[in-house]
Amino acid sequence: MTEKKYIVALDQGTTSSRAVVMDHDANIVSVSQREFEQIYPKPGWVEHDPMEIWASQSSTLVEVLAKADISSDQIAAIGITNQRETAIVWERETGKPIYNAIVWQCRRTADICEQLKRDGLEDYIRDNTGLVVDPYFSGTKVKWILDHVEGSRERAKRGELLFGTVDTWLIWKMTQGRVHVTDYTNASRTMLFNIHDLDWDDKMLDVLDIPRAMLPQVRKSSEVYGQTNIGGKGGTRIPIAGIAGDQQAALFGQLCVKEGMAKNTYGTGCFMLMNTGEKAVKSENGLLTTIACGPSGEVNYALEGAVFMAGASIQWLRDEMKLISDAFDSEYFATKVKDTNGVYVVPAFTGLGAPYWDPYARGAIFGLTRGVNSNHIIRATLESIAYQTRDVLEAMQADSGIRLHALRVDGGAVANNFLMQFQSDILGTRVERPEVREVTALGAAYLAGLAVGYWQNLDELQEKAVIEREFRPGIETTERNYRYSGWKKAVKRAMAWEDHDK
């Protein structure tokens, strides 16, 4: 029998599909990536072709094994992590989608959400699903498809149509239509799932007129769901053994599996999650309550806060303001000055996310004087990412009663040493940057490997987790609070800008 040497993680993201091969020491052996088309039928609408998602993901699986010269019988298991909330409806018989995937960014269901608010359902939705009423989540997207594709609701009631988030769609295709499942983390992002009862919520299904017959079975994040023989040189059937939504996968990849541990992912935006253990903490400060992965893939809970503009604000400096030619240059220019010269940049280009939730806020630069130059503005833009992270962390600490001792970080912007040091300074806590940057894929790999015994337990994984660099606060509390109070003043003045009644 061939030794099972590797784990494969499939990382299905918003703009690309990736496959990563990892060995027993959690080293990356091979990576393959394919981008796919973003479809914008109308302003504010975002779609993907589900067949293109499948084609890009399945081809990366074949490609990543070929690149590493690995046969499928050397793979112990496959783990899947995915863009969350994106909704797909397809025919059970043919596997053919009845409409394009409606992507998490799509705002077309704003009117449905406004009706839910008028119907007085905000408290029910927050109390039972942990979410706010927003087009972001899957439920209203499924309703929209059933409302607009003729005859689809009746077909769904007859069991002819199936709904799934991207993980469910991939597993359906990988198992040739034999397995229709999701995991608790993805289910918790649909606005259809009761996070306390751990079952689909009948009231929400009734309100949105979504037949239960079309919903997947909900399972743990770490167990064998089915097998696939797609990809590789051999015909061996490989267990599919781990599923988690991308942010929960990153939390697990960072081994934040104990109550009070938190990670922040610095991408286009920022996603911060804090594990709250077996207790679902209701937020009074504009955060989401969501399901995370416990030590062996069982249900834990987390608080989540999203910052809309992180890396995107650096792209703005590069593409629109032309102050830098490459995102990596931002650190160089920021360190050419000793501070921001009193400048604050509030990058509220699309409003403000947690904990403010102000869609009418707009971007602004405050504190301009004659002595301010482009380096000050670049530095202030970088600092805004750290300030927004503190906003979210303060909300988390207020909700949970937990004082954070260290923040684990991942995502593209963590390579910026200036930003990471300033993040530590403004939080007053350690910032830990891991050696392995592929923590989302790592989380999916860990979940799959634990399910099949490739790794025995978390203690074994902890030994493999190497912190590449630790950043510690380098400013006094008085200075920290003075700078942060300036940020709070700037945010207050940027809020409600587009709301002409205020």
UniProtKB/Swiss-Prot annotation:
UniProt-listed Enzyme Commission number(s): 2.7.1.30
Record-listed ADP binding positions: T14, R18, T268, G311, G412, N416
SUPFAM superfamilies recorded: Actin-like ATPase domain
Protein's pathway: Polyol metabolism; glycerol degradation via glycerol kinase pathway; sn-glycerol 3-phosphate from glycerol: step 1/1
Any Gene Ontology biological process: glycerol metabolic process
Primary enzyme class: transferase
Binding site for sn-glycerol 3-phosphate: T14, R84, E85, Y136, D246
Signal peptide: none
UniProt xrefs under CDD domains: FGGY_EcGK_like
InterPro entries assigned: ATPase_NBD, Carb_kinase_FGGY, Carb_kinase_FGGY_CS, FGGY_C, FGGY_N, Glycerol_kin
Keywords: Allosteric enzyme, ATP-binding, Glycerol metabolism, Kinase, Metal-binding, Nucleotide-binding, Transferase, Zinc
Keyword ATP-binding attached: yes
Catalysis performed (reactions): glycerol + ATP = sn-glycerol 3-phosphate + ADP + H(+)
HAMAP family: Glycerol_kin
Family per similarity comment: Belongs to the FGGY kinase family.
Function: Key enzyme in the regulation of glycerol uptake and metabolism. Catalyzes the phosphorylation of glycerol to yield sn-glycerol 3-phosphate.
Protein name per its UniProtKB record: Glycerol kinase
Gene that encodes the chain: glpK
